Amino acid sequence: MDRDILYIEMYKLFKRRRAWIGPVLVFLLIIISFPLTLDINSDNPPQIYLSFIWISTLLVTMLGTELIFSDDFEDGTLEQYAVNDQLIEVVFYKILVHWVLIGIPLAFVAFLFILSLNISIQISSIALLCLIISNLIFINFFSLGNALSLKKGSILGLLITIPFLIPVLIVLGKMTTSALLGLSLVGHLSLLVGVMILVASFIPFVISFILRTHLE
């Protein structure tokens, strides 16, 4: 793969600071505001907090990937990549860059928030790992949705991709319960990693095909 494309995509997203700082700030605002609405006498606050973080991460990741292809589609950059037979590379690198600048920072912000709740470092570290893995899954699926709805608006993409992400949220919820109960997480982690590898290996090719059909 051409690493120059990686550097270009990294520079383009880094230059649009609102595109990657904005989602992190929104996420930070959400997780700071949420405890103010929660009854401190709740029977199981750690599980509530963690479940809330999973869903918030999903929504903020959706926000952060909203324009992942649209700008390049409008200015003809995607068409140029297609002519040079580099579409799969640019899709892969766009997803990677969004994961590095948005997905991973979100995971670490959530990790610090979880630590502030007096949740054990072991559970917090597991949550961090799960967030890093799941954010890559989220970004791949939302990128797919954005590719599908490139000419039709983002609602269509959401309607298609959200159902695929519900099982991931279920697995994260099961992992939360198991971690708080001190049960083994090997099975859940293996499943999550397997899904991540499958999604990251397959979806970029699907996106590349969809983008090519838009350009024809």
Model-derived features with residue positions:
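Long, hydrophobic alpha-helical segments
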Residues: 49-66
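A structural motif at transmembrane helix-loop-helix junctions in multipass membrane proteins
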Residues: 121, 130-162, 215-216
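Aromatic- and glycine-rich beta-strand/loop motifs that create alpha-glucan
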Residues: 1-23
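Transmembrane helix segments
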Residues: 145-191, 195-197
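Short helix-to-coil transition segments within interhelical loops
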Residues: 80-88
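Transmembrane helix boundary and interhelical loop/hinge segments in multi-pass membrane proteins
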Residues: 13, 62-80
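Junction motif at the cytosolic side of a transmembrane helix
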Residues: 200-216
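Selective transmembrane-helix segments that form parts of the transport pathway or gating/packing helices
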Residues: 87-114
